[in-house]
Amino acid sequence: MTRRREKAVQPVGTRRAAREFVFRVLFEADRGDVPLQAVFTRAEGVMREGDDTFPQLGPDALHFAEELVTGLERHREAIDDVLHRTIRGWTFDQMAQTDLNVLRLATYELMYTPEPHPPVIESAVRIARKFGGDDSGRFVNGVLAGLSRNLREEVGESPAADMTAPAPADTAPADTAPADPAASEPDEPRDA
């Protein structure tokens, strides 16, 4: 087996599998205009029945996925507000739904969880590359890198604070600009 193929069949990390599961749930909920929790409950049942539509999750990954869904529902308005301020030159209607939903998921984690930013961004870029268009990974990376930088600046943290984890490989597209740190803050973001 070639090195590339060996790498392809390795299991996906628990948190990344949970993120991909939630991304699929979020995408399906948006397309069907169905409540996120209802889609999550259905997806969990489908997964438990052995259907491969959704990735199989162990108990820890499923718990993490449920936390993400709950947080996304609770903070959806604030997340969308931050994304509107961060993404310049694009409206949500102009964006691919895959890119928008990856951004929503990662923005929730960046703002409301203690997760280090680089692994969250890296997972988001991987999901965008897997499910999105040719430029999705680069676009998502650019938006999230700017958002991460702004969030760290808001709490007075040095941009070098996240250097313990590898930085994403792509750079921001020309039409993406970081949010204005002086703009109003979303409700209850995490303290870093």
From Swiss-Prot:
Keywords linked to the UniProt accession: RNA-binding, Transcription, Transcription antitermination, Transcription regulation
**Which SUPFAM superfamilies does this one have?**
NusB-like (SSF48013)
Q: Where is the composition biased (Low complexity)?
A: 159-184
Q: Name one GO molecular function term.
A: RNA binding
Give the record's GO biological process terms: DNA-templated transcription termination; transcription antitermination
Q: Which Gene3D superfamilies match?
A: NusB-like
Q: Which GO terms describe its cellular component?
A: cytosol
User: CDD domains under this entry?
Assistant: Terminator_NusB (cd00619)
Highest taxon listed in the record's lineage: Bacteria
- Is-annotated flag, keyword Transport? no
Q: Which InterPro entries does the UniProt record give? A: NusB-like_sf, NusB_fam, NusB_RsmB_TIM44
Location of the region described as Disordered in the Swiss-Prot/TrEMBL record: 154-192
Q: Which family does it belong to?
A: Belongs to the NusB family.
What role is this protein assigned? Involved in transcription antitermination. Required for transcription of ribosomal RNA (rRNA) genes. Binds specifically to the boxA antiterminator sequence of the ribosomal RNA (rrn) operons.
Against PANTHER family, the record matches this protein to: ANTITERMINATION NUSB DOMAIN-CONTAINING PROTEIN, N UTILIZATION SUBSTANCE PROTEIN B-RELATED
- Any idea what this protein is called? Transcription antitermination protein NusB
Species name for this entry?
A: Deinococcus radiodurans (strain ATCC 13939 / DSM 20539 / JCM 16871 / CCUG 27074 / LMG 4051 / NBRC 15346 / NCIMB 9279 / VKM B-1422 / R1)
